Amino acid sequence: MNDIAAISFSGQMMGCICVDKEGRALRNALIWADMRATKEEEMIRERISEEDFYHLTGHKISPSYGGQKLMWVKNNEPEIYENTYKMLNCKDYIILKLTGEFVTEYTDASSTNLLDLNKLEWSDRLLEVMGIDREKMPALLKSTDVAGTVTDEAAKACGLVSGIPVVCGGGDGVCAAVGTGCTKEGIAHSCMGTSSWISITTEKPIYDEEMRTFTWAHIVPGYVLPTGTMQCGGGSYSWFTKELCKYESLLGEQQGVSKYDLLEQEIGDSKPGANGLLFLPYLIGERSPRWNPKAKGAFIGLKMETEKKDMVRAVQEGVAFNLGVVMDVFKGKGVAIDDMIVIGGGAQSDAWLQILADVYNINIQKPNYLEEATSMGAAITAGVGVGVFENFDVIDKFLKIEETKTPNTDNQPVYSAMKPIFDEAYFALTGVFDKLSEFTK
């Protein structure tokens, strides 16, 4: 334990943990996927224009964000709100337990919708709009700042040595950017995890007129991280394989192979376009690019000839089409993306990587680690914070590209034709989604 130079964290973003002065959690955490604050979203829109809000925060008004969640707590659990000393995100809560310090840093702060992205400070205007007391917000630090040191009590509980520096770290999406080498202008990455996103490092925020994308603060000083995150990317595939692929699970157990290996074969047996089948991947509502908490998932184009192989492929294509909207936003702003590193569990699917290359019409790169990019980003942030590493360029020593998928020109006409149909299908069903939501309250 004496060899530990620093401790740091990557954690899920857009959450809300209410703690009292003793650091005790007052209720269960509200996580990024919690969309209950829809009434608060409407209240905010009555108090500030969507455009002003977007340019202040880099984000849309949405129940996904931590500030709206705390607003919900105030409106629905006033006693908990009154007893809340600070609102924290999950990694900040662990930092509190290790150091006794109530802090956050710019990346997680930018997931609250209470941070002025340009000034990197809590916005008095937004706090007033949401009716949140400024003193309930934690101290703001840089990602590379030392929040404190491991206390004697924490050291005893965790088997650590007291006095180890604890560096703030960052939100998972931003740590992933560092872990995939997106530490300089114009480098892009995508994560195919439960939620899935595309991010690119730039010096200035990218503001989309339709507000389909948003911008995080970056761990690396002088940069920001324009991003589009869908709620249920890899999660859509996980849902499908769990609920509709029980045969493959049993067969895989008998043959000693993964069900995902069997499904890879099925995807390969279905042609691009999935035999005219579309999948809308909105199983838990949607953030970017739709920003519709009432959106639902759907298969469109089912017919007697449809086979499971088509359905599996349609799920992967649907996620790619949805993230493709984010790509189109960035390209429409003049951002050139020729290569993209893809991480997350979904990146283990060679078929999916090829679909991404074909839909985006860029090279898709698979690195030497898929699940550890966020941890790598946090570790490098810690090293820079305590001087073990001179700067973030050290990622080049760890990150290696193992495989590259190039676009298949034979498949692109199909995807170019289907992408607008995918968009048309979503917009045609928005009214249906609204009506169905009445049955799921």
Language-model regions, residue ranges each:
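Active-site phosphate-binding/coordination module
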Residues: 1-67
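Flexible loop residues that form catalytic
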Residues: 12, 145, 345
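Short, glycine/charge-rich flexible loops or terminal/linker lids adjacent to PRPP-binding catalytic cores
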Residues: 34, 148-152
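Short linear loop/turn motifs
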Residues: 138-146, 254-259
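Divalent-metal (Mg2+/Mn2+/Ca2+)-assisted nucleotide/phosphate chemistry catalytic cores
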Residues: 134
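Local beta-strand N-terminus motif with an aromatic residue
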Residues: 3-4, 137, 337
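Active-site core segments that coordinate phosphate-bearing ligands/cofactors
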Residues: 38, 45-58, 64, 68-103, ...
